[in-house]
Swiss-Prot record:
Keywords: Nucleus, Transposable element
Name of protein: 120.7 kDa protein in NOF-FB transposable element
Compositional bias ranges of the Basic and acidic residues kind: 737-749
Region (Disordered): 716-749
Gene that this polypeptide is encoded by: NOF
Organism the protein comes from: Drosophila melanogaster
Length: 1056
């Protein structure tokens, strides 16, 4: 007797009727919808939500039919009007659509799918099968064909195809179901096709175009493997773009195209299959198993767990290295990160894993010698790795190049020289003191020059400094790398220290040339003619810090003597009346002295002792190898990758490189047999061609002596020889574009290691800030935070114009810069000028500008209007940095006179009141001479005699507004005063002090009673002019010097 159901049919129908289980189109809601869980809770969990949805989908006991009748929902019978013909009527070449009113809310599409013979054979039943059934990939083929015929968004799940004509004379039946919209697809074929013919399948499906769908077809079986194999060498996003061939405009996305996460998963699976990686194992266990089985057996030498390391090398590597080391005794060693994922520890911690690599120059490419992955980066780990390299290869290198990592240097020295790097430096220095080569280590250790230059460039001493200083001292270090004797190195470093420590330069009061100026000229002359040997500057930030090594006392004393001698000479160069030294940088001495203690590693002083043929210590080989490894060999991965995947792929690439390298070595050593030379066909040529070839050969006999092989540039295009005929030149012009595309691009040598003939002109040219952007007017910007207040500043053009000219003068005029740096450090505007000149525009600069402007106004509102006459603005901004200082002195000191309180009177702006002259030059120069002249007069307070003297400041700011307006009101019927920049004197002499014109500020009157605008014109050191308008984004060149303008302010800065 069957068991009694927990819920009878009537109760279940009532529950379905009360709940909204249908969508707007009349289809059942998906299983993930909340309504099924609500019905299950209403039935007290007697039937699960999943089972309820299943009952509804299969219409168990016609329950859904009864529910639709009660709810008044028209039933969608997708099988209605299904004919039993071999095909549907084909009046329309595409498909036929029934009326929606006849069959429910959605119309039914009828169309035929034609499968050619090749496509049908790919899914047809196989002959050797016991039961007739389609091949597993038939569902994917049908999905593509249906979308190509009608772009439906449905992701149909197909049931098992029925192949039999015994029931209703239909040989093939297929049926699919869409989980999103509950549509049912049906197809049939009445007659079994012949073996040499294709098949036509009649399909009926609801027209669901325009209904949003979210589901995708599952990617399984052979299609999953096929897509995964395609994705190994292709990005997932690119694969999706290429899979849209069947799509037209406004078509929905095909359901058979997987989304990006699925494609990435398929790529990972295919990569694991390709590498033989099992995902359920951790990387260390996977490497341990591969050490003893598979293609990596014998390649992995040592594995460590805590801290993780893995040393690996192939047998072919060892054989090739043994052959190469006989002719090339130099290797490069370096480390890089960002290739392997960190190994997680049980407590959740992890450490970075570095790849340590030894490479050497090969005949065909860069040859990798030995490698290690390690999460520990100390001397002991590196020494153990190199000791395994020695025991495995059995050959010592004579020269090793590395970067400035003390852990790496100590490991190299302990392995190849059996002493620490400090002892190695001591032995090398003692050999320099002796003429004979005694007690010299067997291996020559050198530092990579590119790492050295980059390390110098990143020193903090160059921060907030003008770029000239960094360029000059970095070129000096480049000079020191070429020193081949101890004495020449000491002379050069002494000159550098003298220049860096001396505050003054030029000539003293007696007319004698200072030592700082003499050494400055000596270094500039060396820079103008110096050229370092060729090297590549592709470097990475992989220096591993370690404690400072204790250097031998003899080396320390040698460097200290250089330092003491330089300090003594620099002390004599600190004269007050001389010009400031533009290269004064005392902060450079400590890092430079520390670097000089390792001078035997980065100069050429030991080159002759070790009989090295290389002029430069360069690790460009290993850096280029790292670049190729990351961008080419590991391009199938998204770096960083698991350690086991990396090792497998790396060993495969190493084996490929070794095969090519051994083939190149064999090709180089094997001689061409004599019978091939004897039987070689002789080329025939005319007399003219023969004579032309003889001329080329004669030239090449001399030219080949000047050529050298570059291991990184292969098949370099040869430039055409001069003197070719017109036809050859035309051919070269036609192929010029092709040759340029085939020629690989060489990375140029670093600028600090090239000669610079115009170095003095280079250092005197006008410099730019870090960005070309200028200060923007506060009215065109948003508010800024000043402390806890959000303030908006309007019409900041007066202040911006002043800051633009002063910052430009700070960059171009070194004497003016030194005055501001040494004597005026309390003024907020001057500090803003310095920050703007060195760092450029930034958000913090606008906050500082707001802080300065806020101090000028007492307004408590959030919007501060800064419109004011620029003369009064300058008096507030440059308080304490005057254009002139007045000194009143009584001939007979009268202590009772009240005028003594004003003995020091400062002026920020000088008003030019002289009128009646023809141009600005005739207004300014006489006024300056008269203003700064000494005057005798009577004191207005006590009646005694007094002397008035005025001294100019670091700058002289002239307000010529009233003078020009008065002049034009007299001579030009009251029009505003206008002039040109050509009429403004470029230099003025005040009390034997030279002042140069640095800029002018123009006032542009507004129309309609609005506020006018100020624009700054900056004059650069070479005489060119620039317009700095804070309503524009960038500065612009200004060449129309004859343009009439209303100048209000002239700014002169002190030159000497």
């Amino acid at each position: 007797m069957p068991a009694k159901p927990q819920v009878d049919g009537h109760t279940l129908v009532d529950a379905f009727c009360c709940a909204n289980i249908f969508t707007e189109t009349g289809a059942l809601k998906p299983r993930s919808d909340k309504v099924w869980m609500d019905i299950s809770n209403q039935l007290k969990g007697a039937i699960s939500a999943k089972t309820l949805n299943f009952y509804a989908r299969i219409n168990r006991n016609n329950m859904i039919t009864v529910v639709k009748e009660r709810c008044g929902i028209q039933q969608l019978d997708t099988s209605a009007n299904l004919t039993l013909n071999s095909t549907f009527p084909d009046d329309d070449p595409e498909f036929q659509i029934t009326e929606a009113s006849k069959n429910g809310p959605l119309p039914i599409l009828y169309f035929n799918l034609e499968l050619d013979l090749e496509l049908w054979r790919s899914i047809a039943p196989k002959k050797d099968q016991k039961t007739e059934k389609l091949q597993p990939n038939w569902t994917d083929t049908m999905a593509k064909l249906i979308y190509k015929k009608v772009p439906l968004p449905c992701a149909f799940n197909f049931r098992k195809a029925k192949l039999s004509d015994k029931v209703d004379n239909i040989w093939l039946r297929i049926e699919g179901y869409c989980n999103d919209c509950s549509s049912i697809l049906k197809g049939h074929c009445l007659v079994k096709p012949d073996e040499q013919c294709g098949i036509m399948i009649s399909v009926s499906v609801p027209d669901t175009r325009g209904i949003p769908h979210n589901k995708k077809r599952r990617c399984t079986g052979s299609r999953r493997l096929e897509i995964g194999n395609e994705l190994i060498l292709k990005k997932a996003a690119l694969w999706r773009k290429e899979a849209t061939d069947n799509m037209n405009d406004d078509d929905p996305e095909p359901s058979y195209i997987p989304n990006l996460p699925t494609l990435r998963k398929l790529r990972e699976e295919a990569t694991n299959r390709h590498l033989g990686i099992t995902k359920d194992r951790d990387p260390v266990s996977s490497l341990y198993l591969k050490k003893y089985e598979g293609e990596l057996a014998g390649c992995i030498l040592d594995i460590g767990l805590d801290e993780f390391f893995c040393i690996y090398c192939t047998g072919t590597q060892v054989k090739t290295y043994a052959s190469r080391i006989k002719t090339i005794r130099k290797i490069s060693i370096d480390a890089t990160g960002s290739v392997v994922l960190p190994i997680q520890k049980p407590n959740g911690d992890s450490s970075y894993v570095f790849l340590y690599q030894i490479v050497m120059e090969g005949d065909d490419s860069i040859f990798p010698v030995f490698q290690m992955l390690s999460a520990k980066h100390d001397t002991a780990s590196i020494q153990f790795w190199l000791s395994r390299f020695i025991s495995k290869s059995g050959h010592f290198p004579l020269e090793v190049v590395s970067d400035f990592s003390l852990a790496l240097l100590n490991g190299i020295s302990l392995s190849f020289n059996e002493c620490r790097i400090a002892t190695y430096i001591k032995k090398c220095f003692h050999s320099l003191l002796m003429e004979e080569r005694t007690d010299l280590p067997p291996c020559y250790i050198r530092l990579d020059i590119a790492h050295l230059i980059k390390m110098i460039c990143r020193k903090n001493v160059f921060k907030s400094k003008l770029p000239n200083l960094k360029d000059f001292y970095t070129r000096c270090i480049g000079l020191a790398t070429t020193c081949e004797t101890k004495d020449s190195f000491a002379e050069l470093i002494k000159s550098v220290l003298i220049v860096a420590l001396s505050q003054s330069s030029g000539e003293d009061e007696k007319g004698d040339i200072l030592s700082s100026y003499r050494n400055e000229k000596y270094l500039l002359a060396r820079i103008a003619t110096f050229t370092a040997p060729d090297h590549k500057e592709t470097i990475e930030d992989n220096c591993i810090p370690e404690d400072q090594e204790e250097i031998d006392e003899d080396v320390t004393d040698f460097i200290s003597n250089i330092k003491i001698a330089a300090e003594e000479e620099a002390l004599n160069c600190n004269s007050v009346n001389c010009r400031p030294n533009p290269y004064f940088l005392p902060e450079l001495m400590p890092p430079l002295i520390k670097l000089c203690k390792y001078f035997v590693l980065w100069t050429n002083v030991m080159k002759e002792k070790f009989c090295s043929k290389y002029d430069v210590g360069s690790s460009a080989l290993v850096e280029a190898y790292f670049k190729d490894l990351k961008n080419t060999d590991m391009s199938i991965f998204h770096r960083p990758v698991r350690a086991d995947k990396f090792v497998v792929q790396h060993i495969r690439c190493i084996e490929a490189v070794c095969k090519l390298e051994r083939a190149a070595m064999k090709r180089k050593t094997v001689k061409t047999p004599s019978f091939i030379k004897e039987n070689a066909p002789k080329k025939m040529c005319s007399k003219e061609t023969k004579g032309f070839l003889e001329e080329i050969l004669e030239e090449s006999e001399v030219e080949y002596l000047l050529q050298e092989e570059n291991w990184k540039v292969k098949n370099k295009t040869i430039k055409p020889t001069e003197g070719n005929d017109a036809e050859d030149n035309d051919t070269d012009d036609e192929n010029k574009e092709m040759d340029l595309s085939e020629q690989p691009k060489e990375k140029p040598r670093g600028k600090y290691l090239k000669k610079c003939p115009n170095v003095e002109l280079l250092y005197n040219r006008p410099h730019r800030r870090k960005q070309d952007e200028i200060l923007h007017n506060g009215g065109s910007m948003g508010p800024v935070w000043i402390g806890k207040q959000l303030l908006q500043f309007k019409n900041t053009c007066p202040f911006d114009s002043l800051v633009e000219i002063l910052s430009t003068a700070y960059i171009d005029n070194f004497y003016y810069k030194s005055l501001l740096d040494d004597f005026y450090t309390d003024n907020l505007t001057i500090e803003l000028v310095k920050k703007y000149a060195v760092e450029g525009v930034s958000s913090s600069l606008y906050c500082d500008r707001g802080l300065v402007l806020k101090s000028f106004f007492d307004e408590k509102h959030q919007i501060i209007k800064c419109d004011a006459n620029i003369g009064s603005f300058i008096e507030k901004a440059l308080n304490g940095v005057p254009s002139a200082s007045s000194h009143r002195t009584h001939i007979k000191n009268n202590h009772d006179c009240r005028n003594q309180k004003y003995i020091h009177h400062r002026l920020e702006v000088i008003d030019v009141e002289k009128v009646g002259h023809l141009d600005v030059q005739e207004v300014v120069i006489p006024f300056i001479d008269e203003f700064f002249a000494r005057t005798d007069g009577e004191c207005k307070i006590c009646g005694g005699q007094q002397i008035l003297e005025r001294q100019p400041g670091p700058h002289v700011i002239l307000d010529i507004e009233f003078a020009m307006d008065a002049f034009h009101q007299i001579h030009h019927n009251g029009l505003p005063g206008t002039t040109t920049l050509l009429q403004v004197p470029e230099e003025i002499l005040i009390q034997e002090k030279k002042y140069i014109l640095s800029g002018a500020i123009e006032y542009v009157p507004a129309m309609g009673g609005e506020i006018g605008h100020y624009i700054a014109y900056c004059r650069r050191v070479i005489g060119s002019w620039e317009v700095h308008n804070d309503m524009c984004r960038q500065w612009k060149k200004f060449s129309a010097l004859n343009t009439k303008m209303t100048l209000h302010i002239l700014i002169y800065t002190r030159k000497n």
